[in-house]
Amino acid sequence: MKATIIFLLVAQVSWAGPFQQKGLFDFMLEDEASGIGPEEHFPEVPEIEPMGPVCPFRCQCHLRVVQCSDLGLEKVPKDLPPDTALLDLQNNKITEIKDGDFKNLKNLHTLILINNKISKISPGAFAPLVKLERLYLSKNQLKELPEKMPKTLQELRVHENEITKVRKSVFNGLNQMIVVELGTNPLKSSGIENGAFQGMKKLSYIRIADTNITTIPQGLPPSLTELHLDGNKITKVDAASLKGLNNLAKLGLSFNSISAVDNGSLANTPHLRELHLNNNKLVKVPGGLADHKYIQVVYLHNNNISAIGSNDFCPPGYNTKKASYSGVSLFSNPVQYWEIQPSTFRCVYVRAAVQLGNYK
């Protein structure tokens, strides 16, 4: 019986076809009709969406800040990320700003172009920058202010250029402007159009220092709180030039050639707190200080003041409602300090606030 069973098994094996070596592809073909689709073996790879603009070559990008400073660039990099909020291009060799240089930068808030070689800006270069608030163009070679600046602009700094003209039209519609810095330019009084700054209703700070202007610009906006005109060639302070500046708190006129301040000038600035008239050619203390309610700091050192009256700084009497002086400088004037009456500074409650010294 065992022999019969063994014989049948051997016969069955001998009837089978010869063994064939199969590859992986052969087994895959056999599975085609098994109800298992090939996609279950090789899942479909989803399409990769194209990447957005990458950081420009050699620049650094982080948290919407693109820093391309100190790279020797001769033009604005292309393909800047559209979500850029701050673009720093200072300390390069850019010579011109062209239309399209800032296309798609609708979210840009701050543009820094300090210390380049920019001499030309196309009229429509800043048109795409519909949210720009701060524009820094200092230390370039501009001869005029750029046209068609964004209406959203709040701060403009253009000191150390070659600007000789300030036209009223360049500031038209800039109702959000707060700060304008124009110092160290070859400006003359004739180059500033009358009322050039008047249309900027929120303007709070103007600095036109170290230029060639000989008079205080006319038609300044009443919103001003700080006016810095130090280091110019102004010879006189006219009452009319300060008319309407009711909010002015700080007036800088040091390092000029001022020999006189018209009576009534300070009355036009009723909220003035600081007056800098040091390093001029004054021969007497400006009138109106005693009647000024809020003024606290008066710098008059390095002038030609030879006498000080007992009522030059404080109103008559002791029971007066006036802010106390925190700083009065009179050193380096020909006045002899021992000739000043003791009651002259009766409204000064801190002795160290008054600085006197020998004339050199």
UniProtKB/Swiss-Prot annotation:
Superkingdom to which the source organism belongs: Eukaryota
Signal peptide (residue range): 1-16
Residue spans of the LRR repeats: 74-94, 95-118, 119-142, 143-163, 164-187, 188-213, 214-234, 235-258, 259-282, 283-305, 306-335, 336-360
Keywords assigned by UniProt, alphabetized: Disulfide bond, Extracellular matrix, Glycoprotein, Leucine-rich repeat, Proteoglycan, Repeat, Secreted, Signal
Propeptide intervals in chain numbering: 17-30
InterPro entries: Leu-rich_rpt, Leu-rich_rpt_typical-subtyp, LRR_dom_sf, LRRNT, SLRP, SLRP_I_decor/aspor/byglycan
PROSITE patterns named among the record's database cross-references: LRR
Family per similarity comment: Belongs to the small leucine-rich proteoglycan (SLRP) family. SLRP class I subfamily.
Function text: May affect the rate of fibrils formation.
Subunit annotation: Binds to type I and type II collagen, fibronectin and TGF-beta. Forms a ternary complex with MFAP2 and ELN. Interacts with DPT.
Protein name as annotated: Decorin
Native species: Bos taurus
Gene from which this protein is expressed: DCN
